[in-house]
Each structure stands twice: as C-alpha cells, then as structure tokens.
Amino acid sequence: MKLAQARRPATSKPRLISTWLLRPLLLLLTAALLYQSWFLLHIVYWRSYSPTTSAFMQDRLKIMRQQNPAASLQHQWVDYEQISSHLKRAVIAAEDARFLQHQGFDYKAIETAWKKNLKQRKWAAGGSTISQQLAKNLFLSTEKTVWRKSRETLITLMLEEFLTKRRILEIYLNIIEWGDGIFGIEAAARHYFGISAASLTPAQAAWLASIIPNPRFYDTRRTLPKLLNKSRIILSRLPAAKIP
C-alpha cells in the first residue's frame, strides 16, 4: 500500500503578485537612499574641506574643450575672511535679501517669481535662494525638469541642515560662474579689475553681483545701461544687507 505523498500548500496568487511588486520597490528605495547618501556625504565632508570643482564647472569645461582641447578654467579658492564684505553684501542684496532669515527657500520670492512668470507667460524668473543656487551648481545639470527640481529641493535642505549660513555663502562665492571660464570671486576680481577679492570696492562689488544671472553674456557687454543701472540699485542696498 502506497503512502500518500504530502502536498505543498499552494501559494496564493495575491501573495505572488505582492512579492513580485515588493522586490523592485525595495530595490528602487535602496538605490534612492544610496543616491541621496552620496550627496549627504559630500556635504558633510565640505563642513571642513572645500570643494575644488562642481558639476557646473565640469560641464562648462567639457563644452569649452569641444572648441579648444587645451581650454582651462580660471578658479582659485579664497577663505571667507579674504573676501570683501562689500562683495558679500552686494551678492546678498542682489540674489537673496532674506538669506539669513529663511531655511533655504524664500516663499515670498517664489510667489513674486510665479506671478511674474504668469504675467509674461513664460518661465523666466525662478526666485531661487543662494542655497538653491549652490545645490544646482554643486551637483546638478541646467535642465529644467520636475526630477531635477526635486533633487535640488532635497540637496538644499541638506545644505541648510549641515552647513552654516557663513559656510554656504563662502562656498557659493567660490564656485559660481562669473564669466566665460571664470569661476569663484578671486578669479573674477582679478579678471575684471586686476585686484584680489579682498580689495573690491563697494561699486566693484555691486557690479560683480549684477552680472551673476548671466555672467558670460555680460563678460563682453560690461557697460550696458541696463547692467549699470542694476549695479547702482544694488550699491544703494548695500547698507541694509546683512551678512553671516
């Protein structure tokens, strides 16, 4: 007489489906956490050590070398104390007047930019703070997508959480673009005025702050009436600008 063979319990179809869905989701979540950890590790490292390059600098150098293989960037890091206080005030007055008050996002500026974009029926003004601009420069491309904006938001939160306002401003002034192949305020001061960043006058600082939105364009159009008028407005706002 044959013994009856034990039967395996049938795996239910819903359980198979849930397992099939759960594994890719866990893999995706793990990949996302690793990706964000890469940003976080860099930011924590920069609390004590200064970045020597940025994603934007690398992109610009790649483009420049397509035309000239021997092209190089002009860039020299200088510490916070070696940067003119006039320049710090000018940049805050021009780019982020509430820099010391917000936590990375200036909602009043965002609202103003949104209304301006609706009025002009195009995406022009962005209302980005210094922290948001730093996030883009350090890690991201210049594309305007929802995915890039979400990464920018997360990186901005990390910058504000792990770096002081003083450190954020110091890195920002040292890595943003100021002209064609010109990065950082020391290279900019020497390129435009033949002096160090520490020696910039209020008028020179205001002019440099005025070209930040489109530095390559203004590099060859330094006396445009619109630009000079903007620099005068920034100059008038220097006394009210608060720096860390």
From Swiss-Prot:
Q: What does the UniProt record say this protein does?
A: Peptidoglycan polymerase that catalyzes glycan chain elongation from lipid-linked precursors.
Looking at the UniProt entry, the stretches that span the membrane are: 25-45
User: Where does the record place a coiled coil?
Assistant: none
Top-level EC class, please?
A: transferase
Bilayer topology: Single-pass membrane protein
EC identifiers of the protein:
2.4.99.28
Q: What is this protein called?
A: Biosynthetic peptidoglycan transglycosylase
Give the chief site where it resides.
membrane
Pathway(s): Cell wall biogenesis; peptidoglycan biosynthesis
| Example GO molecular function | pentosyltransferase activity
Instruction: Name the UniProt key words of this record, in alphabetical order.
Output: Cell inner membrane, Cell membrane, Cell shape, Cell wall biogenesis/degradation, Glycosyltransferase, Membrane, Peptidoglycan synthesis, Transferase, Transmembrane, Transmembrane helix
Q: Where in the cell is it found?
A: Cell inner membrane
Q: Which InterPro entries match?
A: Glyco_trans_51, Lysozyme-like_dom_sf, PBP_transglycosylase, Pep_trsgly
- Protein encoded by which gene: mtgA
